[in-house]
Every structure is written in structure tokens, then in C-alpha cells.
Amino acid sequence: MQALLFISYGAILGASLRWAIGLLFNPLFSSFAFGTLIANLFGCLIIGVLLGLFWQFPQISAEWRLFLITGFLGSLTTFSSFSSEVVELFFNDKWLNGFCVLMMHLFGCLAMTVLGIWIYKICLNFYLNPIHFGFAQLNQQIHRYEIRVIAYIAKFFVSF
């Protein structure tokens, strides 16, 4: 029962933030719901940061994981809204818009999750080694990650 409360409290906050993001960003574009994309991208970025944190510190309680990932970010990011918006575009014969929205959500969310993990790792390295951590080292780390991402993307497109 206690786990359900943690999930519920997180879900209230996540759903409220998602609603506010939709109100703010959806009017910007008439062709698709930009707020849903922003909510999903932002949520995936935060999920990446939290994954890095939880991997580094597995002793963080299950309640925090339930509150943050299952509750808050589970209700902030939304697969159902995303899928209904894409299907609506397809049913209205806006195939190109639908496909573009689909790709932006899919690849954007994956990229933001990876970026969140990198942000966490970079911040952790800076926190642990503030004197020895300089811009040259930061650039080297970013370059190593960029090479990995480019390799993964190339493998993905070659697989077709």
C-alpha cells in the first residue's frame, strides 16, 4: 500500500507538469502537439540522469525509484498521447507529419535518455574531481560518447 502512495504522489506531480507543458507549448504548432514532444524529451532526459544515479548508488530506496520513475516520470512522459496523436495524423492523411512526429519522439527520446546518463556521469566526475576536472577532460569525454552514439546510429541504419 505504501508503494502505491509513492507512485500516486509522483504521478500527481508528473501529470500536472505534463498538463502545464501542453498548455504552454501545444499552441506553438498547429501541425502536431509540441507539448507532448517536449514532455517526452524532458522526461527521458531526467530518466537518463536518474538511471545514472540509481546505477551509481543502488542503495537508494525503492520508494524513491517508485516516486520518481514510475510515478512522476511515468505520468510526465506519455506513450498513449504520443501514439494517439500520430494515429490521428495518419487518419487525417498527414502521413509525412505523422512519420516525422514518430521519428522525433522515438529517436529524440532515446537520445535524451543517453544524454541524461552522460550529464549525470559528467557531473559526478566533476563533483568527485573538481580540481583535476577541466574543459579538456570534458571535451575528451564528450568526444568518446559522441563516437559511440555515431557508431550505434550507423549500425541501426545499416541494419535496414
UniProtKB/Swiss-Prot annotation:
Record text on activity regulation: Na(+) is not transported, but it plays an essential structural role and its presence is essential for fluoride channel function.
Keyword Secreted among UniProt keywords: no
GO BP term (any one): cellular detoxification of fluoride
Compartments, as annotated in UniProt: Cell inner membrane
The reaction(s) this protein catalyses: fluoride(in) = fluoride(out)
Alphabetical list of InterPro entries matching this protein: FluC
Transmembrane segments: 5-25, 34-54, 67-87, 99-119
CC annotations in GO: plasma membrane
Keywords: Cell inner membrane, Cell membrane, Ion channel, Ion transport, Membrane, Metal-binding, Sodium, Transmembrane, Transmembrane helix, Transport
Coiled-coil spans in chain: none
An example molecular function term from Gene Ontology annotations: fluoride transmembrane transporter activity
Origin superkingdom: Bacteria
Membrane topology: Multi-pass membrane protein
Binding site for Na(+): G74, T77
Family: Belongs to the fluoride channel Fluc/FEX (TC 1.A.43) family.
NCBIfam families: crcB, PRK14196.1
Functional summary from the UniProt entry: Fluoride-specific ion channel. Important for reducing fluoride concentration in the cell, thus reducing its toxicity.
Name this polypeptide is given: Fluoride-specific ion channel FluC
Taxonomic source organism: Haemophilus influenzae (strain ATCC 51907 / DSM 11121 / KW20 / Rd)
